């Protein structure tokens, strides 16, 4: 969505009534090229990451935008702080479907994602590690130098 539209949505609804989700398909993130997909047939992943019907680039064949890009975009588009943007992508969707939302407190499951925030608008949020039940299941935990 264009930046002005996102900004209008957030202003009109307020952050209390907004959530961030992604419907990214399984082929997203694959290198550019042509692939066979059992759901839609032959697809093509373009250099810019878009997923289209092979030979018909005007027809999208699935979403390719990761939630990390959505977080960075809403921060820029709606002039939102990081804590609020992450909340819209984690706590709010969980609450909306009645799922237990995570918390940093004694006895709570140690499930979280460690990421780096871009220093410029051109950079992407980078996932450094995913921790599930206190175990690193993706990446490596980064520890700052003391």
What are these regions (language model features)?
Residues 1-3:
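Glycine-rich anion/phosphate-binding loop at the beta-strand->alpha-helix junction
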Residues 5-115:
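His/Asp/Glu-enriched, well-ordered alpha-helical/loop segment
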Residues 100-146:
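C-terminal cap of metal-dependent C-N hydrolases
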